[in-house]
Amino acid sequence: MKTMTGRLVAAALVCGGAFSGAAVSAGPDDPLVINGEIEIVTRAPTPAHLADRFDEIRSGWTFRTDDTQALEMDDFENSGMVFVEEARAVWDRPEGTEGKACADCHGAVDDGMYGLRAVYPKYVESAGKVRTVEQMINACRTSRMGAPEWDYIGPDMTAMVALIASVSRGMPVSVAIDGPAQSTWEKGREIYYTRYGQLDLSCASCHEQYFDHYIRADHLSQGQINGFPSYRLKNARLNAVHDRFRGCIRDTRGVPFAVGSPEFVALELYVASRGNGLSVEGPSVRN
């Protein structure tokens, strides 16, 4: 039977690198203050349901190099904000057979969407299920605007989610995991700890058991999603949560669930809950 370290070594070798067993840290004590005014909580007490897993929870920002961290501290340096500004124009633009814009129902985005990113995914009574921000956007487009759905992880959708996240930066993540959301949360937890692919790895393998170690050149974080959508220097674009989930499962040589699927919605709720208490940070900058 393979040991866990053996699995991670195998994963590194697939990518042409090697696993370093030494725990490291890239400026974890540096404060994140955006534009000199938006204070972001990047380290927080561990949520009760993770009390036996971590001493504290940490934003992915604390695992990045000083240079990468600095890019997120100024909106003029954060390339993700280019897409936020594009989405602001779309917010006010009428579309569809109804000729309506987002602003017609929700008003100014800074007011109408304030606080929303902090509590999603959430159980939506009218839908009878847990919904993501992306699903709510597409529901508005089809039912209220008479416009076609956006690609779930396409550039239009991801830019709009980044805009919605940006107006809540600094607010604490606070997704509900009890009541009608509990069964979805439990499904997400099951997926998180399930091993996938030929490398037989789970989300927890990298982001819980071996976080703060290196695998090849990647400094493993706790896998928090409070900073999504995230502008990655690696691919020079905004990246959506489900796109990242899909990539992680592919890295195990497994077959990922579909974006927007019940499985990924459940996983998103669970992973978001692991960051309860951190600040909404999107669009973040990562490697």
From Swiss-Prot:
Heme c 1 binds at residues 102, 105-106, 140. Residues 74-168 form the Cytochrome c domain. Substrate binds at residue 244. Induction: By thiosulfate. Heme c 2 binds at residues 203, 206-207, 248. It is an enzyme of class 2 (transferase). Binds 2 heme c groups covalently per subunit. One of its GO terms (molecular function) is oxidoreductase activity. Residues 1-26 form the signal peptide. It holds the Pfam family SoxA-TsdA_cyt-c. Belongs to the SoxA family. Its cofactor is heme c. It comes from Rhodovulum sulfidophilum. Disruption phenotype: Unable to grow photoautotrophically on or oxidize either thiosulfate or sulfide. Thiosulfate:cytochrome c oxidoreductase activity is zero in periplasmic extracts prepared from cells grown on thiosulfate plus malate. This is L-cysteine S-thiosulfotransferase subunit SoxA. InterPro entries: Cyt_c-like_dom, Cyt_c-like_dom_sf, SoxA. The active site is at residue 248. Heterodimer of SoxA and SoxX. GO terms for cellular component: cytochrome complex; periplasmic space. GO terms for biological process: sulfide oxidation; sulfur oxidation. It is found in: Periplasm. It catalyses: L-cysteinyl-[SoxY protein] + thiosulfate + 2 Fe(III)-[cytochrome c] = S-sulfosulfanyl-L-cysteinyl-[SoxY protein] + 2 Fe(II)-[cytochrome c] + 2 H(+); S-sulfanyl-L-cysteinyl-[SoxY protein] + thiosulfate + 2 Fe(III)-[cytochrome c] = S-(2-sulfodisulfanyl)-L-cysteinyl-[SoxY protein] + 2 Fe(II)-[cytochrome c] + 2 H(+).
